[in-house]
Amino acid sequence: MKRHLNDVVLVFLVFIFGVKLGKGQNTTIQVINVGVVTDVGTTASNLSLLAINMSLSDFYSSRPESRTRLLLNFADSRDDVVGAAAAALDLIKNKEVKAILGPRTTMQASFVIEVGQKSQVPIISFSATSPFLDSGRSPYFFRSTYDDSSQVQAISEIIKVFGWREVVPVYENNAFGEGIMPGLTDALQAINIRIPYRTVISPNATDDEISVDLLKLMTKPTRVFVVHMNRFLASRVFSKARETGLMKQGYAWILTNGVIDHLVLMNGTDIEAMQGVIGIRTHFPISEELQTFRSRLAKAFPVSELNIYGLRAYDATTALAMAVEEAGTTNLTFSKMDGRNISDLEALSVSEYGPKLIRSLSQIQFKGLSGDYHFVDGQLHASVFEIVNVIDGGGILVGFWTQDKGLVKDLSPSSGTTRTFSSWKNHLNPILWPGITLTVPKGWEIPTNGKELQIGVPVGTFPQFVKVTTDPLTHETIVTGFCIDFFEAVIQAMPYDVSHRFIPFGDDDGKTNVFDAVVGDTTILANRSSYVDFTLPYTTSGVGMVVPLKDNVARSSLIFFKPLTPGLWGMTLGSFFVVGFVVWILEHRVNSEFTGPPQYQISTMFWFAFSIMVFAPRERVMSFTARVVVITWYFIVLVLTQSYTASLSSLLTTQQLNPTETSIKNVLAKGGPVAYQRDSFVLGKLRESGFPESRLVPFTSPEKCEELLNKGPSKGGVSAAFMEVPYVRVFLGQYCKKYKMVEVPFDVDGFGFVFPIGSPLVADVSRAILKVAESNKATQLETAWFKNIDKTCPDPMNNPDPNPTVSFRKLSLDSFLLLFVAAATVCTLALLKFVICFLIQNRIILNDEFYRGKRMKEMWLKFMESDGESYISRVRSTCPQVLIQPREEDIDPING
């Protein structure tokens, strides 16, 4: 029945074309033979043949003045590579065709192109899409369609906008299927998308073989597949995928236009198996001409709908007719080859018309049914693709991809101007995914074969982080510690379940690649990242240097001099003399207690000044000015004595703990031994810093480290210990009264969880680490494992000095300078007042000529004698019992 239908179609085409050609023939028209190589007997070929005929009919009807007419010569390739080559040879040798339209497949075209190159006959294929058929192979090959690599950018941007990090290509095992892989791989690598493995399916594979390949996919974690194959193989693959459970929720399938462009040719059962698939479809701008052509085709061939083959065949035929018209009618002959002792291919005649025709084809430009039509380097170039979602028996448009804007919901000018990636909802309309769900697949999940993640746990030095014990009853291995609890919290914070099992091991390098992950106190290092992937760090970073503390204060019999600097001692002593002298000047003329023999006055002066420091002096101060000076000095002495007492108390009672070393440079220069944690990368860091092997001492426990530090280098110990900051926190929690972290000489990224390179878990676990770190859970875990440590000593990273050294500072003159300036000012003003009053009182001596030559002597005598005219003296003379009231201790108990 199928062959009968094909024969009917061919007769119909020949009849129609013969009528058209007969009507247009006259003596001025040159008939040009062209060949058509196709697989007669398929729906796609029949549509193409009908479109070719309609194209010629429309072309010559609209251009009756044309000087040429194309005469089609059909040849059946019989869906075979050799058959296509034989058909092309026959058309060139026997029909002397000037160009060939076809063949249909990539494999056929590869051979036919060689034939066209030999005979200089242009080959125009409207369905061979493999990038392997590069027009650079032959200037006589023209691809009247888009090559498969033109859609890889659209595919990669779909993958990127959904946040998928791994994809598995599933493609046909031939030149057509493999042709897209180089371009697809490059496009995915450019955006850091990993291809962990590939699935290659033979076009001749049985259903059982297809099922086996699909079952292998189920055992892998990746759930995003890019499918590139012909529609016949794709229908079988998706039928088996539905049977094996690969079309359930959580899976994502992306189809190339090799299948999506031909959905109209597929039956309902095949399309139903593809529910939820998204794909790339060639975009054809809607036009009146396209709608008219669709209606005409439906009337002429009602058994099928218009597909890409029909449009491409129509435009390719129009382009060939225009090129022939442009090339003219000269040099239509073939140059015959000597056929003796050579093969049929070598004996091909060479078309003299070919060079002119390819030049004309390269220059052709017009607006066809499929859009703007113009060959660039022998190919058409795509600028827009449609993104479709296979739903309800067809493809629903959900967006577009354009060369300028990337993924957009529509082609309106307001849809965006730059290729920016945000939420997929800003780029595409809602999509129904496999499993009939709107939830976007995350792109991977733990394989459905029941296997648990094998989590390696390195057994370390500090049990607070990882501790491995064995249950005495069940003999079951029990793994605990801060790292383990933190990992469990991270797993709970992830959006899906991850079944896992902890397996302790003794080496944390992770090079064996036996485990699915490593969880423990494993430090993130650059050299390790070359063979594993790390998550974000979940602890503080750095390698700390821990050194002993010692009391550096030497206590002697002269320690009471240390609170004050020599400058302050000198200023204080000098101030006592100055204040005593000023008070004597102000008081000796009005206060009898400051008079008497010179020796008595001098002793009284200094006695008064120094006695202020310990008790109230017995000498009373009478003048107001002197009282101001004394009160000021009282305040200064009070401040000085209180400060001195506090400083001396601190010096006598507090240990002055200072680190024995302050930097790694000092330790390296002194040449003493240092300790490091055994089996740690710290050993390499110390070697790089210049420490010789003989000076490096390993320790296996905090107790051993403390023993080495306590002994010191002189007794077989070490001068410093180097360990990672999290370990320092634990160590100082036990011994912070004796040791201190003084420096972080090496920067590292802290502890992280380890996964194989490319593991899709890394990004999800890192995001979960951030969630836990920002929640109360992290604080609760730290409290549970380090609460006793934090009570004993602060965190060395939050407080880098868990044992702040009580560094003694002597009291200096700078601290009290303002007080001494105030005292000096008061004394100066008091003296100035006294001098002015004294000069006014004795101005007669200064002005009277009687005292000429003896004024200084008289003034001195006046200065030294008592001032009986002063207010104080007059009050004392009238009320001596009030002003001179003896103190009780001065009264003789016998004589009264």
From Swiss-Prot:
<feature type="topological domain" description="Cytoplasmic">
    <location>
        <begin position="617"/>
        <end position="620"/>
    </location>
</feature>
<keyword id="KW-0406">Ion transport</keyword>
<comment type="subunit">
    <text>May form heteromers.</text>
</comment>
<keyword id="KW-0732">Signal</keyword>
<feature type="topological domain" description="Cytoplasmic">
    <location>
        <begin position="837"/>
        <end position="896"/>
    </location>
</feature>
<feature type="transmembrane region" description="Helical">
    <location>
        <begin position="816"/>
        <end position="836"/>
    </location>
</feature>
<feature type="signal peptide">
    <location>
        <begin position="1"/>
        <end position="24"/>
    </location>
</feature>
<feature type="transmembrane region" description="Helical">
    <location>
        <begin position="596"/>
        <end position="616"/>
    </location>
</feature>
<keyword id="KW-0407">Ion channel</keyword>
<keyword id="KW-0812">Transmembrane</keyword>
<keyword id="KW-1133">Transmembrane helix</keyword>
<feature type="transmembrane region" description="Helical">
    <location>
        <begin position="566"/>
        <end position="586"/>
    </location>
</feature>
<feature type="transmembrane region" description="Helical">
    <location>
        <begin position="621"/>
        <end position="641"/>
    </location>
</feature>
<feature type="glycosylation site" description="N-linked (GlcNAc...) asparagine">
    <location>
        <position position="527"/>
    </location>
</feature>
<keyword id="KW-0813">Transport</keyword>
<dbReference type="Pfam" id="PF00497">
    <property type="entry name" value="SBP_bac_3"/>
</dbReference>
<dbReference type="GO" id="GO:0019722">
    <property type="term" value="P:calcium-mediated signaling"/>
</dbReference>
<feature type="glycosylation site" description="N-linked (GlcNAc...) asparagine">
    <location>
        <position position="46"/>
    </location>
</feature>
<keyword id="KW-0675">Receptor</keyword>
<feature type="topological domain" description="Extracellular">
    <location>
        <begin position="642"/>
        <end position="815"/>
    </location>
</feature>
<keyword id="KW-0325">Glycoprotein</keyword>
<dbReference type="InterPro" id="IPR001638">
    <property type="entry name" value="Solute-binding_3/MltF_N"/>
</dbReference>
<keyword id="KW-0472">Membrane</keyword>
<dbReference type="InterPro" id="IPR044440">
    <property type="entry name" value="GABAb_receptor_plant_PBP1"/>
</dbReference>
<dbReference type="InterPro" id="IPR001320">
    <property type="entry name" value="Iontro_rcpt_C"/>
</dbReference>
<feature type="topological domain" description="Extracellular">
    <location>
        <begin position="25"/>
        <end position="565"/>
    </location>
</feature>
<dbReference type="GO" id="GO:0005262">
    <property type="term" value="F:calcium channel activity"/>
</dbReference>
<dbReference type="GO" id="GO:0005886">
    <property type="term" value="C:plasma membrane"/>
</dbReference>
<dbReference type="InterPro" id="IPR017103">
    <property type="entry name" value="Iontropic_Glu_rcpt_pln"/>
</dbReference>
<dbReference type="InterPro" id="IPR028082">
    <property type="entry name" value="Peripla_BP_I"/>
</dbReference>
<keyword id="KW-1071">Ligand-gated ion channel</keyword>
<dbReference type="InterPro" id="IPR001828">
    <property type="entry name" value="ANF_lig-bd_rcpt"/>
</dbReference>
<feature type="glycosylation site" description="N-linked (GlcNAc...) asparagine">
    <location>
        <position position="341"/>
    </location>
</feature>
<feature type="glycosylation site" description="N-linked (GlcNAc...) asparagine">
    <location>
        <position position="331"/>
    </location>
</feature>
<feature type="glycosylation site" description="N-linked (GlcNAc...) asparagine">
    <location>
        <position position="267"/>
    </location>
</feature>
<dbReference type="GO" id="GO:0006816">
    <property type="term" value="P:calcium ion transport"/>
</dbReference>
<comment type="function">
    <text>Glutamate-gated receptor that probably acts as a non-selective cation channel. May be involved in light-signal transduction and calcium homeostasis via the regulation of calcium influx into cells.</text>
</comment>
<comment type="similarity">
    <text>Belongs to the glutamate-gated ion channel (TC 1.A.10.1) family.</text>
</comment>
<feature type="topological domain" description="Cytoplasmic">
    <location>
        <begin position="587"/>
        <end position="595"/>
    </location>
</feature>
<dbReference type="GO" id="GO:0008066">
    <property type="term" value="F:glutamate receptor activity"/>
</dbReference>
<dbReference type="Pfam" id="PF00060">
    <property type="entry name" value="Lig_chan"/>
</dbReference>
<feature type="glycosylation site" description="N-linked (GlcNAc...) asparagine">
    <location>
        <position position="204"/>
    </location>
</feature>
